[in-house]
């Protein structure tokens, strides 16, 4: 591991934030567009802490895609490997907020530009600069982007980089929960660091007993589990 840059691969999208809390999508008066996507957010947070980050993804060659790129660049994120396409639009996620802070998502992403990001667009030489590669499960649906993840993870591991995985489960994006669980368990084997919530832990292991569930996550190359409650 010779690099000093955090690489992150996956989705960047527009979160449509409701103007009113505690009502259904149909009752929300209006929505405001905000740049989001967990892999992009990780880059932004790391850069704000003084680190260097590079984001690997693809956006639509549309107003929302260019808005995202401008805002990520303003955060100091390296976008030299970010692609644009006119084959699909930038993903949108409409958000409904409940009074207790819980969120419901409705995604417009069938497919979106990020899902068309192909393994051929990944250059293994990039990862000489990476000390770590981070990814989530939102882009692991059956698509070119899933295979791009495998290419990036393989290159990062061969370069000696740390691989970090946050499942960040979004059930509405998958045909069924069994397919999501299978994908997460497959990619979990390739990670060194796993970040997981209490809800995700129960979904993946089948038990809410923390002492029984957490040891089940130390599979493959997993060496560190970050467990969050709530």
Residue ranges and their predicted role:
Residues 159, 173-230:
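Conserved phosphate/ATP/ADP-binding segment of small-molecule kinases
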Residues 50, 76, 158-160, 221:
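Glycine-centered short loops/turns at secondary-structure junctions
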Residues 5-7, 131-132, 224:
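Structural motif
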Residues 1-78, 117:
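Glycine-rich phosphate/adenosyl-contacting loop at the front of the ribokinase-like
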Residues 160-167:
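Short beta-strand/loop segments at the ligand-binding rim of alpha/beta enzyme cores
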Residues 47, 73, 154-158, 188:
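Anion (oxyanion) recognition and catalysis
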Residues 110, 138, 168-172, 199, ...:
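Active-site beta-loop-alpha junctions enriched in small/polar residues
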Residues 52-135:
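Conserved N-terminal subdomain of the carbohydrate kinase-like
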